[in-house]
Amino acid sequence: MTYKLTAVPAFRLPEDYRHMGEPSAWAKMTRPGQPMHSFLEAAFFDADGNLWLSDVPYGRIFKVSPEGDWSLAHQIDGEPHAMRIAPDGRHIAVDYRHGLIELVG
């Protein structure tokens, strides 16, 4: 059985958060010669219904509220990928440069 799905945008990165400066080394390696304002992945929801996303090339962690409001939750010198909230409440991420890290602050 085949299902036809239609993808529609659920959220859109606000213009203020689009990186317009020099591409990171990761962006240059992944998309040589092309602009890259973000590369969002690692989406998951916390217990309060917030959506968390990592922006790999620019070391940013975004939180999107259930109402669709974006905030920059963390900015690190790294390339964060997968993230989760640990059972004890700590925010844990896998980072290409630093390995397994805890996001604090």
Predicted feature locations:
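Sequence-structural signature of mature extracellular/luminal beta-sheet repeat domains
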Residues: 1-105
